[in-house]
Amino acid sequence: MASSNLIKQLQERGLVAQVTDEDALAERLAQGPIALYCGFDPTADSLHLGHLVPLLCLKRFQQAGHKPVALVGGATGLIGDPSFKAAERKLNTEETVQEWVAKIRKQVAPFLDFDCGENSAIAANNYDWFGSMNVLTFLRDIGKHFSVNQMINKEAVKQRLNRDDQGISFTEFSYNLLQGYDFACLNKLHGVALQIGGSDQWGNITSGIDLTRRLHQNQVFGLTVPLITKADGTKFGKTEGGAVWLDPKKTSPYKFYQFWINTADADVYRFLKFFTFMDIEEINALEEEDKNSGKAPRAQYVLAEQVTRLVHGEEGLVAAKRITECLFSGSLSALSEADFEQLAQDGVPMVEMEKGADLMQALVDAELQPSRGQARKTIASNAVTINGEKQSDPEYIFNDEDRLFGRYTLLRRGKKNYCLICWK
């Protein structure tokens, strides 16, 4: 992405929700590289899909020659951002937040280049400047620059104040000051001139712009990316099992890949613009090709491949595709023990069973059939496979050969109903 028209290119991809003083920012970018930052609060032990768009935006700016700062909120994570939240967040312990900070720093690292010369990325933690700050310094040097009148009129806070059942604590109310000071501090330390974040962060970003001007007399800018929505109105980044995480131990690469494969046609080309680095022309050509092919669209596979590779690397993508192909074909010989571990984690329904169980009981315990009688009929009708092999004997009892890697047996009823038995 050429730096001179970077904002326009982001707008073409639908990646700009709001921007402060767009002309002045475009002019500043045209003058040469800038430093910019995005903050990630450790509210869990992993980032999730909602963090991916701003994180990839940092990467887009770095590819255009700018210097990204990834700020992990070791201090702000102890407080909790009230922006557009219906209720007060539960406060986490300092030890927990520090553990999460370390995990999130590791997660952010592969997306950015920390060794590429002048625009090498920087990892920062706002606990470094807040951890030793006393309350008098905070109130005198930061608090005096904030108007409570303006703070309570910010949309992100106003929604909470207008709820009869929920107020807002002074702790969360102060969050706006902390994030504002982050911007001013990073401006002084690293010359940061731009903050990016989700559109729910607009109020916090503008506070930081104002504080930086007051403290350092510098003009800085803010840009927000849209909160991703799906065409059908349902929430993006959620499955029946909850959030889709970037940590492979919380959402397996297979499950992650399947999430993107299941993207609706109405969303897929937009998501290619948000979550991949494909050229707009390439995405438009793919859309045209899918429209005229008369076959199932290819876009979902392109999207799943690109994003899984970005997040889980080539190895994660290869494993996800291998598991997908084996489940589709019914031949499990190519699956490794690690592949079965992914399936057991979240890939297919899983049940633990004692050795010596019979097939009818397994179908009932696996909730593939409601009763032994129904299970008997299904088995006899040749509709059940064990590890890809059909089994039509209702009295069948599992043996050691059925236990792949000594632990796993994959049952299938019909074409798509799977359950993985993990033997105790």
Swiss-Prot record:
NCBIfam families per the UniProt record, alphabetical: tyrS
SUPFAM superfamilies, per the entry: Alpha-L RNA-binding motif, Nucleotidylyl transferase
Gene Ontology cellular component list: cytosol
HAMAP family referenced in this protein's UniProt entry, alphabetically: Tyr_tRNA_synth_type1
Source species taxonomy: Bacteria, Pseudomonadati, Pseudomonadota, Gammaproteobacteria, Enterobacterales
GO molecular function term, any single one: RNA binding
The enzyme's E.C. designation: 6.1.1.1
Top-rank EC class of the record's enzyme: ligase
S4 RNA-binding domain span: 357-414
UniProt record, GO biological process: tRNA aminoacylation; tyrosyl-tRNA aminoacylation
Major subcellular site: cytoplasm
Task performed by this protein: Catalyzes the attachment of tyrosine to tRNA(Tyr) in a two-step reaction: tyrosine is first activated by ATP to form Tyr-AMP and then transferred to the acceptor end of tRNA(Tyr).
Residue interval(s) of motif 'KMSKS' region: 235-239
Family classification: Belongs to the class-I aminoacyl-tRNA synthetase family. TyrS type 1 subfamily.
Record-given protein name: Tyrosine--tRNA ligase
Reactions catalysed, as given in the entry: tRNA(Tyr) + L-tyrosine + ATP = L-tyrosyl-tRNA(Tyr) + AMP + diphosphate + H(+)
Entry's localization field: Cytoplasm
Binding site for ATP: K238
Keyword presence, RNA-binding: yes
InterPro entries: aa-tRNA-synth_I_CS, aa-tRNA-synth_Ic, Rossmann-like_a/b/a_fold, S4_RNA-bd, S4_RNA-bd_sf, SYY-like_C, Tyr-tRNA-ligase, Tyr-tRNA-ligase_bac-type
Residues engaged in binding L-tyrosine: Y37, Y175, Q179
Keywords: Aminoacyl-tRNA synthetase, ATP-binding, Cytoplasm, Ligase, Nucleotide-binding, Protein biosynthesis, RNA-binding
CDD domains the UniProt entry points to: S4, TyrRS_core
Subunit structure: Homodimer.
Sequence motif 'HIGH' region, location on chain: 42-51
